[in-house]
Amino acid sequence: MVRRIVVALGGNAILTDDPTAQAQEIALETTAEQLLPLIKDNDVEMVVTHGNGPQVGNLLLQQLEANSEKNPAMPLDTAVAMTQGQIGFWMSQAFTRALIKNQMERVPVISVVTRTVVDAKDPAFDKPTKPIGPFYDEAGKDDMLKQYPDWVFVEDSGRGYRRVVPSPKPTRIVEAEALKPLISSSVLVTVSGGGGIPVVEAEDGYVGVEAVIDKDFSAARVADLVEADDLLILTAVDNVFINFNKPDQKKLEEVTVAEMEGYIAEGQFAAGSMLPKVEAALDFVKKTGRPATITSLENLEDFLKHDSGTKILP
C-alpha cells in the first residue's frame, strides 16, 4: 500500500551561515539526499514544504536598498512569491541531481507556486510574530528602527533581534485540488513554499496581503487537503522534549493529543521555536485522526526503520 507523507522542512535545511545562492543550493543538495530514502522503495508519495523566513527578509532588504520611483520595492506578498519560486527552483535542482545520482530518474520533480487563503480579520494582523530576515545586535536594531520606524523587532532565542511580521493562520490552499493528480502520478511535489503566498478572498478572486504564513501550519493544511497519511515536521532535534535543558528533561516518543495539550498548558514549549511545530502537528492529528511526527533530518533513517521521533497520536 502506498503511503502519502507531507514533509515540512525547517530553515536549517536551506540556510546555514552563508546566505549566498550557492551555499543554499549546496545545503539543499544534502537535504535532498537525506529525503530520498523515503521514496526509494516506491511505497511513499512525498510532498515537500519549506520555510522562507530568512530569505524573504533578506529579499525585502535588497528591494528597499534599490527602491526608487522608476524601480519601486515589491510588497511582502510579492516577495513571498519570489522566494517561493527561488527556493522551489533550488529544490527542484537538488532533487533532480540526487535522483540521478541514486539511479531514480523515473521520479519526476515539480515545484508549484501556491496561494494560501487567510482570514482578513485574523487577529495576527495586529500582532506581528513571524521572524524574517537577518539577526541584529541592539545597535543594529536601533539603526533599522530609525530607517523604518513602523517595523517591529523581537529578541529571538538569545541570538539577537529580528524583524517580525503578521503570521495569520492558513484556512486553505487555493491549488490543493490541482495537486492531487500530480501526487497520485508519483511526482515529487514541492508546494506551499514559505507557507504559501498569503491571500484573502475577494468578489473577483483573491488579494495578496502583507504577511508570512508559518510553514508548519501551512504544511498541516496541505497534509489535510491532499489526504496525507502522515505529516512529518523536520527540525533541528530528533525529539521534542519536556523540561528542556533541565536536569530532568525527557524526550517524548509516542504521545497523545491530550498529553501534548497538557504540556502546552504547562508552558513546556518555546513560543518562537518548538511551540508552533507542536501546534501544527496537533492541528493535523485532530482534524484527520492520522499521526504527525516531529524529528530531524539526521534521524530520518531511524524514523523509517523504527518510527522514531516524537509521534503524536489521536
Q: Model-derived features: where do they sit?
A:
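C-terminal catalytic "cap/lid" subdomain
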Residues: 2-314
